[in-house]
Amino acid sequence: MYSGRLFYFCSMKHLLLFDDPAIRGSLLPFTFTRPIADLRVGILKISEKWEKYAGAEVSYWTQDYLQNLFPRSEQQGIAINGSWLPDSNSWQQVIALKENEALFFGKTLLATACSAQEKSFAFVSEKKIIQATQEPILLQKTWHIFQFNAAEIRKDFILLTAGRKSQPIQDPHTRCYGEHQIFIEEGVQIRAAILNAEGGPIYLGKNSEVQEGALIRGPFALCEGSTV
């Protein structure tokens, strides 16, 4: 037996991440060339975080001049504020929404069902307003990218490594502390480095390189193909 609420969400497989006009301007110049949800905070971009929780693809509702580069899907789906940094509680609130409801925090729209034909958010006025059960983490200022980075690395580390096994460190001259919080993807090269994850996780992305003499303290992330 299923509830109408669950059936509704399961039929809404697509997530549409929208640029909040009240926030986008405060994130310039980064948002000159990309939607808010394409910004990276922690290990993952905001869009990638939502994809991990949803197990579904996302698209973007952004500025007209960016829309061709970041296409909007023609599917009906859930519109989600692109500045919202999700966690498990956020996701539970999203999947609990009914078609006639809109999730707000104060006056800030967080999520609502949305058709592909909508060109503005005027339709939200017809929805039943539901207030979020806890204050959301919103990327509202440029410095939040750095202020939230450590906490987001910790959250993303769990999303990316749950149920997976790290690649081993082959180099005998590399020293590790807090090894249970170090995760190494395939193709990583490490030579004569010190990795200290006692204060937070260390994530080394695919084909990244840690060169000789590097001293790394967590929380820390080296993304795919990068060098330190």
What do these predicted regions represent?
Residues 2-8, 12-180, 187:
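Terminal amphipathic alpha-helical/low-complexity segments used for targeting or macromolecular assembly
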